[in-house]
Amino acid sequence: MNSGVVTIIGRPSAGKSTFLNTASGEKVSIVSAIPQTTRNAIRGIVNTTKGQIVFIDTPGYHKSEKKLNLKLQEIAKTRLEEGDAVLYLIDLSREFGEEEKNICSLLIPLQNKTVIGLNKADLKSSKADLVKKELLSLLPDIPQERIFEISALKDEGINEILSLLIELLPEGEALYPEDIYTDQDVVFRITEIIREQAILHTREEIPHALYAGVEDAEMHKNGKELWVRAFLYVEKESQKAMLIGKGAAVIKSIRIKSMAELRKIFPYKVQLDLQVRVNKNWRQKDNIIKKISY
């Protein structure tokens, strides 16, 4: 059998998290319409009859000089070098622009281990032929047989990509037991679900100005309930007010939806105490950036 690590790369909102969740059959990475909601190198594990793929979902690659974005770029580059293979996902509903060309430049020395998924091929706005032409000029050593038109959301073309990726991996025993689909710890998964729900409940500048943190987590009732005290952090008092909402309606909804999502993931109930705090200009603080993006 073959087994190894596959790094997923692409522009923000190219469908990387959706692909990972669909391929693994479980919720591993948070999904939203807001670009760059993945801040960490998240592992998802897929087992097939031919072997095991350990996927790393990297942050959406986006050139920017902001501290947080620079850290996310660093994570993406490091994971590319570490992977046994690379899956490059492209959103066919968007123009093939400078960000795609920047990613292609990173992949030039990695063409022998790269597979490309043209995502959202089911949409009428798909520009598959034009994108393929661009790719073949920028990455001439990637054979056309390694370029797939897929829909991560509808689970179309996923199995074909998985089969090819398995072939690119080295021969060896599985890296993880077959019943494991992610190596994320409990606290990390809780913070990601809370952050996802906060993003889905907000708009404008708030999704990029927030992060979640778990203060306490204790098991009760003989392992049947996990009690969690967590906080959502924003940069301004005005953002805090919006996140709480009139009559605390917004934060209450975030808490309830988070508990419902967590119940789907864990074999026990999660009781969540969720509050909002202000951490002024946290996106400029190295210790916070290091804490939430690793």
Swiss-Prot record:
<dbReference type="GO" id="GO:0070181">
    <property type="term" value="F:small ribosomal subunit rRNA binding"/>
</dbReference>
<feature type="region of interest" description="G4">
    <location>
        <begin position="119"/>
        <end position="122"/>
    </location>
</feature>
<comment type="subunit">
    <text>Monomer.</text>
</comment>
<dbReference type="GO" id="GO:0000028">
    <property type="term" value="P:ribosomal small subunit assembly"/>
</dbReference>
<feature type="binding site">
    <location>
        <begin position="57"/>
        <end position="61"/>
    </location>
    <ligand>
        <name>GTP</name>
    </ligand>
</feature>
<dbReference type="GO" id="GO:0005829">
    <property type="term" value="C:cytosol"/>
</dbReference>
<keyword id="KW-0997">Cell inner membrane</keyword>
<dbReference type="InterPro" id="IPR030388">
    <property type="entry name" value="G_ERA_dom"/>
</dbReference>
<feature type="domain" description="Era-type G">
    <location>
        <begin position="2"/>
        <end position="171"/>
    </location>
</feature>
<comment type="similarity">
    <text>Belongs to the TRAFAC class TrmE-Era-EngA-EngB-Septin-like GTPase superfamily. Era GTPase family.</text>
</comment>
<dbReference type="InterPro" id="IPR015946">
    <property type="entry name" value="KH_dom-like_a/b"/>
</dbReference>
<feature type="region of interest" description="G5">
    <location>
        <begin position="150"/>
        <end position="152"/>
    </location>
</feature>
<dbReference type="GO" id="GO:0005886">
    <property type="term" value="C:plasma membrane"/>
</dbReference>
<feature type="region of interest" description="G3">
    <location>
        <begin position="57"/>
        <end position="60"/>
    </location>
</feature>
<dbReference type="InterPro" id="IPR009019">
    <property type="entry name" value="KH_sf_prok-type"/>
</dbReference>
<dbReference type="InterPro" id="IPR006073">
    <property type="entry name" value="GTP-bd"/>
</dbReference>
<keyword id="KW-0690">Ribosome biogenesis</keyword>
<feature type="binding site">
    <location>
        <begin position="119"/>
        <end position="122"/>
    </location>
    <ligand>
        <name>GTP</name>
    </ligand>
</feature>
<dbReference type="InterPro" id="IPR004044">
    <property type="entry name" value="KH_dom_type_2"/>
</dbReference>
<feature type="binding site">
    <location>
        <begin position="10"/>
        <end position="17"/>
    </location>
    <ligand>
        <name>GTP</name>
    </ligand>
</feature>
<dbReference type="InterPro" id="IPR005662">
    <property type="entry name" value="GTPase_Era-like"/>
</dbReference>
<dbReference type="InterPro" id="IPR005225">
    <property type="entry name" value="Small_GTP-bd"/>
</dbReference>
<feature type="region of interest" description="G1">
    <location>
        <begin position="10"/>
        <end position="17"/>
    </location>
</feature>
<dbReference type="GO" id="GO:0005525">
    <property type="term" value="F:GTP binding"/>
</dbReference>
<keyword id="KW-0699">rRNA-binding</keyword>
<dbReference type="Pfam" id="PF07650">
    <property type="entry name" value="KH_2"/>
</dbReference>
<keyword id="KW-0963">Cytoplasm</keyword>
<keyword id="KW-0342">GTP-binding</keyword>
<feature type="region of interest" description="G2">
    <location>
        <begin position="36"/>
        <end position="40"/>
    </location>
</feature>
<protein>
    <recommendedName>
        <fullName>GTPase Era</fullName>
    </recommendedName>
</protein>
<dbReference type="InterPro" id="IPR027417">
    <property type="entry name" value="P-loop_NTPase"/>
</dbReference>
<keyword id="KW-0472">Membrane</keyword>
<keyword id="KW-1003">Cell membrane</keyword>
<dbReference type="GO" id="GO:0043024">
    <property type="term" value="F:ribosomal small subunit binding"/>
</dbReference>
<keyword id="KW-0547">Nucleotide-binding</keyword>
<comment type="function">
    <text>An essential GTPase that binds both GDP and GTP, with rapid nucleotide exchange. Plays a role in 16S rRNA processing and 30S ribosomal subunit biogenesis and possibly also in cell cycle regulation and energy metabolism.</text>
</comment>
<keyword id="KW-0694">RNA-binding</keyword>
<feature type="domain" description="KH type-2">
    <location>
        <begin position="202"/>
        <end position="280"/>
    </location>
</feature>
<dbReference type="GO" id="GO:0003924">
    <property type="term" value="F:GTPase activity"/>
</dbReference>
<dbReference type="Pfam" id="PF01926">
    <property type="entry name" value="MMR_HSR1"/>
</dbReference>
